[in-house]
Structures are given as structure tokens and as C-alpha cells.
């Protein structure tokens, strides 16, 4: 048996070589540049052994095959040429695996992503487990890159160009059955027999390539290909607004390989990989990846977390139902919902049923697993079943007296160790805990709507919250699949505080005559997933504007909304999508209904709807106020670091990921340039644009928030 640091070669008695991948000291297998020589040494031995019948690659990790390439390798490249050389090295290694004269099979269990899937594609056959942990994909586009070790060339030839483009352009991950249906894998088996099935496949002749569906064969021809790339190009441009250069390069590289052959395709792939690695977009996206990984490792405090065996929820509304779902179905914890109205409990239970039933229909979940997860959720109209809950999340109406009453009731009806977590979006946690007998166990846990989709939670300790309460709440959030940031107990916390001036400015521009669709389109073009006016409609105008008076009382008139505009809209019974009318009008088909701007909105707010500003001018006014407020939050220690500030903005409100978050964006512009822009806007539009003191000082000194590397703070 030949040992290497990450690869073990074992030749079985039946002359099948099993190469076990196990990167020492790491939970996940990732490919590193230094492994190339190790793999080549093994390939040399395989070629020298004339008795071998086949080869199987398998992972020793319990839940991943290969999670991708080590992203630090890209960060270490100083030039496009260095990154291109890295890609060519990967391509060459995969080519050597593919060129082995005997069948090579990948036995896949767990994540098989990026470079891991490229290695599997270089094999002659693939078998994977039917485990939910098994996913296959090429997520490089999410880091502003493209697959650089042959993925753009091998995948289209294996599963067809249109399906391959969808995977590569979106980073979409396939489950086992989807992969089998598309021909990405040759078999799906239980984990217990994975290796034996792969070995048997390796004993046969090389698996012949499955004939592509007729549609894919047509699209691979010159006419079909031209039409496909034109259509996909238009769709991609509309989705990315031209902000992500990787998607354009992916289309170019895949088309080059199909039109000019694999040699030209591999060459184009390596060159594009090198160039994309040096783009500011890729650097920003990689910084978000590193920051989010870092946040997920952050325990929140130095104290050890308390055990978490069960959770209670007060309120069965939209938020309560969503929190119950992620607690039971993601965290796997028993949940007890209390609502004074049985209909509230039914609503919360139906919410989880709808989510899980959708997964069953899409064949992502077995019906038996759905029933098992639903069995974790129960309901009550009183406090029966709450006596031993470790943590109780309050998701009732946004009213201070009511929330204080909830604290008192929970303390009377739960254990001495029970934590009370409030899902408030605006009320100070210190005020909610004001009359608590155990204030050290009261904390804020702010989810964003819709709960099952939004990745961020804000965890808000008040001055008296214990370190263990913080650590335990952070632990729960991670179990729920969330990315938690710990923020200070100040009005608006972090996300809503930086969002409010952004939305206020959009409303102000409406009153000045800019059109709803122009404002929204300008911010989508800038890189936000939706514009500020549409966002307000989606959240609910009544809900979204409730925080403005709270912020105005705390921080003064820079948070003032345009006079009487919000009240005029609410008095006209406009709440947004939830009641079918806001700034937009909605059809009758729920969230998927088409919307159109309601022209009646302009006279209602006393505006003409005849704008004069360009899209960049509109975006500049909204975004600069957000940046200024984010810097104030650092200065006032509302957030613990600019890392948390960037993650909070990207994951909480969809700040453009390709800009890396507010603080990376300020660094890319230069603090001095941001100050100059804000001073110009202050002269034009008023003192709300006055740059904060910290920004002015940083601009004068030429300072930045981040160091030059993707992972370190100054």
C-alpha cells in the first residue's frame, strides 16, 4: 500500500486499484496545487502495473467526496498568468486521469463540487449514493470564476449543452436522482454498497457514453447552437445586468469548445479562468465566501453554549410559522408553538406542511421523512409543554407592553435555564427585558422574511445579557442553517438601520418626480435583487415603514421620511403585495402574479412622475446614504467588525455581492472619493448627505477598512 498525504493507493486482490481521498486534518476534501505531484506519482504506478483491471476514486470523509478546489490558491496568484497556469495544471492532471487505459470510476458520497466534479468528469464512469448529502455541481460562477480544470468542456459533451449551461451559469447543484436522469452519473446506490458497485463497474469495459436526447443533439449543431447561445446570452444579461463578467466568459468558452474543438476550448477555459481571477468582482465574491465561512465559525462569545434539546415559539403568524419550520426541519429540534388562536397554530403547521410537501413533489424528500419532520412540531393555546424548553422565541405583534408580558409569562411557565429570544425588528431588547427576573437570559433574535429563504439573523444582546445566552442563541441560529451576526442593542440594530435611509431616499425621489419603475430599475442595474420601492411592497408598506419613527426619534431628522407620503399611502389602504396594492398593483395569483405600477400613486403623493435623473444618479443617492450609515454603525460598535457589516448587508438586504459589501465597496472607491461624492450631494440635496466624521478622517488619511487580502481586516 502506497501512502501519500491526501491520496492512498490500495490494490485489491481482484486487481482493482482504490484511490482513497482524505486530506489530513480537514473536515472537507479540497484540491490543492501541491496534490498534483502526489496524484501523478499514483498515476505512474497505475500505468506500470499491467495486471490492473480498473481504478476507483473514493473519499474517506463521512459526508463529502471533494468539496472543490482550495480557494486560497487563487488568492495567492498575483497575475492572470499565474491563475491561468493553475488552471492548465488542473486540466493536465484531469487529462492524465482520463487517458488511463483501464476504466476509472468515481464513487461519490456527499458534496462533489467544483474541482471535485471536474475530477469525476475526467473519470470514465460515476456512481453516487442516494443520500441527501450527495450533491453535484460547478459553483465557480458564485465566486466570479468558471470551472478551470476542464468542466466547461466535459460537462456539455456528457449531458448536453443546454443542461450544462444551466448548471455552469447558475452554480446549480443536482441531487443524485437528478444527476442520474441527466446522465451525469451511471448509477445511484445506498452508501453501504457504493464501493462494491463502483468496483464492479470498474471491472467492465469503459462505460459507453449515453446518447444525448434529440433536443440536445439539435442544440449541439451549428444552427441550434447559435440560437441557444443567443437566447441564453439575453436571459443571462437580463439576470446579471452585466455586473458579473464570469457569465459572459462561460458562454464564450463553452461555445468555443463546441465550435472549434476541445483543444481550443481548454485553451479558452484556462485563459478566461486566469483573467476572471484578477477581476474585482471575483475578488469581492471570494471575500464574501471567506467572511461567511469565518462568521459560521464564530461562537459569538467566549462562554460555552448551553445544551439545546427543544424550542418554543410564541405566535403562529408568518414569522412564527417560518421559525418553526427552520427549527424543526433544518435544526431537527422539537418545536412547540403557542398561539392564543387555534387558527394561528394551524397556519404555522400548514406553513411547514406546504414547504415539505413541495419538496416531496419535487422528489427532494421522501414522504416518510416529511412526516418525521412534521412530527417535531406541535401546538397549544396555553403553556402546556413549555416547562422544559431550552429556548423560547417570541414572534408576536410589535408592541413593547405585549412583549414584556410575554417575558413575564415565559419566566412563570418555563425552566430556570430557559432563554427568551425576541424576534423584534425595532424595539430595544433592553426595554423588553426591563422587568425580567432573569434579564441575563433575554436576547434579540431577528429573522428576516421569508424566514426559510433569508440566510441572515441578527443576534442582539442587551447590556445585561450573559455570554452563555449569546453563545447558545448563536448555536441555535447555525443549527437553523442561518448566518448569525451579533449586533448592539441600538435602534434599528444594523440591517434595518442602513436600509431605512436607502428606502427613504427612494420615496423622496418619487416625490421629486422620478417614476417608480425608473427608481427600481436603477437599483437593480446597480446590483440589488429588487429595487427599493418593490422591496417595500414585498415586505409590506405598513411593516416596512414602522421602524422609521423609531429611527427618527433615536438619530434625528436624517431618518425623516418625506412629509405625509407614507401616511397618505397607508390611509389609501395600500400595504403592498399582501393586499394586492401598494406602489404596484398585483394580480390574483399570489407571489407569482404579475405586477404593474399603479399610476394613481403619483397624484396620491403629490408627484408628477416626470423624472430628470439618470439611473446612476438615482442609485448614487440611495447607496451613498446606506454606506454613510454603515460606517456610523462601525463607529458606534453596532456591529463588531466590518466583516459582519459586509455579511449583514449582502445576506440581509441583497447588497450586490460582486461589490463585496458596503465596506469593501467604500475601499474600492476610496474613502476620499466617497466623501467627495457625499459632499457634492449634500450641497445639492441637503445635510442628510453630510459624510460622517469617521469617513472624513479615513479619506484624509487614505485609509481603508480591509487589508488587501481577501480574508484579513485592518
Curated annotation (Swiss-Prot):
Gene expressing this chain: fadJ
Spans annotated as 3-hydroxyacyl-CoA dehydrogenase: 306-714
Family: In the N-terminal section; belongs to the enoyl-CoA hydratase/isomerase family. In the central section; belongs to the 3-hydroxyacyl-CoA dehydrogenase family.
Protein name: Fatty acid oxidation complex subunit alpha
Reaction(s) catalysed (UniProt annotation): a (3S)-3-hydroxyacyl-CoA = a (2E)-enoyl-CoA + H2O; a 4-saturated-(3S)-3-hydroxyacyl-CoA = a (3E)-enoyl-CoA + H2O; a (3S)-3-hydroxyacyl-CoA + NAD(+) = a 3-oxoacyl-CoA + NADH + H(+); (3S)-3-hydroxybutanoyl-CoA = (3R)-3-hydroxybutanoyl-CoA
Subunit structure: Heterotetramer of two alpha chains (FadJ) and two beta chains (FadI).
Organism: Escherichia coli O8 (strain IAI1)
CDD domains assigned: crotonase-like (cd06558)
Region spans: Enoyl-CoA hydratase: 1-190
Pathway where it operates: Lipid metabolism; fatty acid beta-oxidation
Amino acid at each position: 500500500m502506497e501512502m501519500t498525504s491526501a491520496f492512498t493507493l490500495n490494490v485489491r486482490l481482484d486487481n482493482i486499484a482504490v484511490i482513497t481521498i482524505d486530506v489530513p486534518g480537514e473536515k472537507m476534501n479540497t484540491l490543492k496545487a501541491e496534490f498534483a505531484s502526489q496524484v501523478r506519482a499514483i498515476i505512474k504506478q497505475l500505468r506500470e502495473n499491467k495486471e490492473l483491471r480498473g481504478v476507483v476514486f473514493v473519499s474517506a470523509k463521512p459526508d463529502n467526496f471533494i468539496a472543490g478546489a482550495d480557494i486560497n490558491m487563487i488568492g495567492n496568484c498575483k497575475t492572470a498568468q499565474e491563475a491561468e497556469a493553475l488552471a492548465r495544471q488542473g486540466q493536465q492532471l484531469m487529462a492524465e486521469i482520463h487517458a488511463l487505459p483501464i476504466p476509472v470510476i468515481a464513487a461519490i458520497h456527499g458534496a462533489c463540487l467544483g474541482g471535485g466534479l471536474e475530477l469525476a468528469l475526467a473519470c470514465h464512469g460515476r456512481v453516487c449514493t442516494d443520500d441527501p448529502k450527495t450533491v453535484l455541481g460547478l459553483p465557480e460562477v458564485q465566486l466570479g470564476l468558471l470551472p478551470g480544470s476542464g468542466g466547461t468542456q466535459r460537462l456539455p459533451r456528457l449531458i448536453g449543452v443546454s443542461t450544462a449551461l444551466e448548471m455552469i451559469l447558475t452554480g446549480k447543484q443536482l441531487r443524485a436522482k437528478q444527476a442520474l436522469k441527466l446522465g451525469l452519473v451511471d448509477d445511484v446506490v445506498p452508501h453501504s454498497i457504493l464501493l462494491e458497485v463502483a468496483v464492479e463497474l470498474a471491472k467492465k469495459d469503459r462505460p459507453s457514453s449515453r446518447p444525448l436526447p434529440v433536443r440536445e443533439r439539435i442544440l449541439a449543431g451549428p444552427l441550434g447552437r447559435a440560437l441557444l447561445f443567443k437566447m441564453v446570452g439575453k436571459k443571462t444579461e437580463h439576470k446579471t445586468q452585466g455586473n458579473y463578467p464570469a457569465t459572459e466568459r462561460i458562454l464564450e468558452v463553452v461555445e468555443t469548445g463546441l465550435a472549434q474543438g476541445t483543444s481550443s476550448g481548454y485553451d479558452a477555459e484556462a485563459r478566461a479562468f486566469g483573467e476572471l481571477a484578477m477581476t474585482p468582482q471575483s475578488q469581492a465574491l471570494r471575500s464574501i465566501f471567506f467572511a461567511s465561512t469565518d462568521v459560521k465559525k464564530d461562537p459569538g462569545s467566549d462562554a460555552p453554549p448551553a445544551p439545546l434539546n427543544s424550542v418554543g415559539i410564541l405566535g403562529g403568524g408568518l414569522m412564527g410559522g417560518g421559525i418553526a419550520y427552520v427549527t424543526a426541519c433544518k435544526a431537527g429540534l422539537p418545536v412547540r408553538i403557542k398561539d392564543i388562536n387555534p387558527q394561528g397554530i394551524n397556519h404555522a403547521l400548514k406553513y411547514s406542511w406546504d414547504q415539505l410537501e413541495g419538496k416531496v413533489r419535487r422528489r427532494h424528500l421522501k414522504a416518510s421523512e416529511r412526516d418525521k419532520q412534521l412530527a417535531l412540531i406541535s401546538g397549544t393555546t396555553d403553556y402546556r409543554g413549555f416547562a422544559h424548553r431550552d429556548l423560547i422565541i417570541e414572534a408576536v405583534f410589535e408592541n413593547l407592553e405585549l412583549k414584556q408580558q410575554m417575558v413575564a409569562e415565559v419566566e412563570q411557565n418555563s425552566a430556570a435555564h430557559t432563554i427568551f429570544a425576541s424576534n423584534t425588528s425595532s424595539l430595544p431588547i433592553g426595554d423588553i427585558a426591563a422587568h425580567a427576573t432573569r434579564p441575563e437570559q433575554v436576547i434579540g433574535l431577528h429573522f428576516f422574511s421569508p424566514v426559510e429563504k433569508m440566510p441572515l439573523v441578527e443576534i442582539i444582546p442587551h447590556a445585561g445579557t450573559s455570554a452563555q445566552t449569546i453563545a447558545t442563541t448563536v448555536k441555535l441560529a447555525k443549527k437553523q442553517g442561518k448566518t448569525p451576526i451579533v449586533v448592539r442593542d441600538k435602534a434599528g440594530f444594523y440591517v434595518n438601520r442602513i436600509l431605512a435611509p436607502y428606502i427613504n431616499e427612494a420615496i423622496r425621489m418619487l416625490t421629486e418626480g422620478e417614476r417608480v419603475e425608473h427608481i427600481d430599475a436603477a437599483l437593480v442595474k446597480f446590483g440589488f435583487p429588487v429595487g427599493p420601492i418593490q422591496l417595500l411592497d414585498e415586505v409590506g408598506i405598513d411593516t416596512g415603514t414602522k421602524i422609521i419613527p423609531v429611527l427618527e426619534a433615536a438619530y434625528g431628522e436624517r431618518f425623516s421620511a418625506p412629509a405625509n407620503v407614507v401616511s397618505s399611502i397607508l390611509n389609501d389602504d395600500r400595504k403592498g403585495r399582501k393586499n394586492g396594492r401598494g406602489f404596484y398593483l398585483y394580480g390574483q395569483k399570489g407571489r407569482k402574479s404579475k405586477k404593474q405600477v399603479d399610476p394613481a400613486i403619483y397624484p396620491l403623493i403629490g408627484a408628477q412622475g416626470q423624472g430628470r435623473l439618470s439611473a446612476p444618479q438615482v442609485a448614487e443617492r440611495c447607496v451613498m446614504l446606506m454606506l454613510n450609515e454603515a460606517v456610523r454603525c462601525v463607529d458606534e460598535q453596532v456591529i463588531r467588525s466590518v466583516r459582519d457589516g459586509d455579511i449583514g448587508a449582502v445576506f440581509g438586504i441583497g447588497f450586490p455581492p460582486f461589490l463585496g459589501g458596503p465596506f469593501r465597496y467604500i475601499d474600492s472607491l476610496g474613502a476620499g472619493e466617497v466623501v467627495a461624492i457625499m459632499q457634492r450631494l449634500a450641497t445639492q440635496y441637503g445635510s442628510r448627505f453630510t459624510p460622517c466624521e469617521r469617513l472624513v478622517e479615513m479619506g484624509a488619511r487614505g485609509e481603508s477598512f480591509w487589508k488587501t487580502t481577501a480574508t484579513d481586516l485592518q
